[in-house]
Amino acid sequence: MAFALLRPVGAHVLYPDVRLLSEDEENRSESDASDQSFGCCEGLEAARRGPGPGSGRRASNGAGPVVVVRQRQAANARERDRTQSVNTAFTALRTLIPTEPVDRKLSKIETLRLASSYIAHLANVLLLGDAADDGQPCFRAAGGGKSAVPAADGRQPRSICTFCLSNQRKGGSRRDLGGSCLKVRGVAPLRGPRR
C-alpha cells in the first residue's frame, strides 16, 4: 500500500482576502505579542503584519523591507555606540591599574579581576595606615600569613597580593607603596592611630 503525501493548497491562494493563521503562525503571533510587551521587535512585527485595519490604505510592496532595513541599521548603530562606550571605559580603567610589565595589554576579564584586587589592596593600605612598614599591607591584613597548607619545610607559605609583590620586587617600603598608590589617585594616605 502506497501513501501519497499531498500538500494542501493554502487558503490565502484561493481566497486572498481571508486571513487564516496556521498553528505555527498563531504561536509565533503569541510569542511576538510577548516580545512587544517588552518593546522588542515592534517594527518587524508591524512590517510583517502590514497596515492595520484602520489605516485606510495598503502599504506598497517595497515599503516593508525598507522600514526593517532602517530599523536594523539603527539598532546596529546603537550597538556599535554601546560597544565603543564599553571599550572606552575599559581603556580608562586599564590606565588606572598598575601592571607588570607596564605596557601589558589586559583582556576585559583580566582588567576586571585586577581592578577588584587593586581596590582591595588600596583598602588595606588605607585601613592599616603606617602599621604595615614592611610594604605588605595585604599580607598583614590577611592574618599575618597563617595558611591551612604548610610549606615543604614546615613553615607556613605567605600569601601576598599582586601589588604588594610588585612593590617588594621593586624594593620599596610601605611608605613608598602607600604613597605612590594614593598620590597617583590624588588622595593622601590616612593617618590612623598607631597601635
UniProtKB/Swiss-Prot annotation:
Disruption phenotype: Lethality within an hour of birth, possibly caused by rib defects that lead to respiratory distress. At birth, neonates display obvious caudal agenesis with tails that are shortened and curled. They also lack the normal cervical flexure of the vertebral column, and their hindlimbs are curved towards the midline. Neonates also display low-set ears, a thickened neck and loose skin. Defects are caused by impaired formation of somites: cells from the paraxial mesoderm are unable to form epithelia, preventing formation of somites. GO terms for molecular function: bHLH transcription factor binding; DNA-binding transcription factor activity, RNA polymerase II-specific; E-box binding; protein dimerization activity. GO terms for cellular component: nucleus; RNA polymerase II transcription regulator complex. Residues 44-65 are annotated as: Disordered. SUPFAM superfamilies: HLH, helix-loop-helix DNA-binding domain. Residues 56-65 have a biased composition (Low complexity). Expressed in heart and skeletal muscle. Specifically expressed in a subpopulation of embryonic stem cells (ESCs), that are still undifferentiated but primed for ifferentiation. Expressed in hematopoietic stem cells (HSCs). Changing A75N: Does not affect formation of a heterodimer with TCF3 and ability to bind DNA. It is found in: Nucleus. Residues 70-122 form the bHLH domain. The modification Phosphoserine is found at S60. PROSITE patterns: BHLH. GO terms for biological process: anterior/posterior pattern specification; ear development; establishment of epithelial cell apical/basal polarity; mesenchymal to epithelial transition; muscle organ development; muscle organ morphogenesis; negative regulation of hematopoietic stem cell differentiation; neuromuscular process controlling posture. SMART domains: HLH (SM00353). Keywords: Activator, Developmental protein, Differentiation, DNA-binding, Nucleus, Phosphoprotein, Transcription, Transcription regulation. Gene3D superfamilies: Helix-loop-helix DNA-binding domain. Heterodimer; efficient DNA binding requires dimerization with another bHLH protein, such as TCF3/E12. Interacts with MEOX2. Early transcription factor that plays a key role in somitogenesis, paraxial mesoderm development and regulation of stem cell pluripotency. Essential for the mesenchymal to epithelial transition associated with somite formation. Required for somite morphogenesis, thereby regulating patterning of the axial skeleton and skeletal muscles. Required for proper localization of somite epithelium markers during the mesenchymal to epithelial transition. Also plays a key role in regulation of stem cell pluripotency. This is Transcription factor 15. The gene is Tcf15.
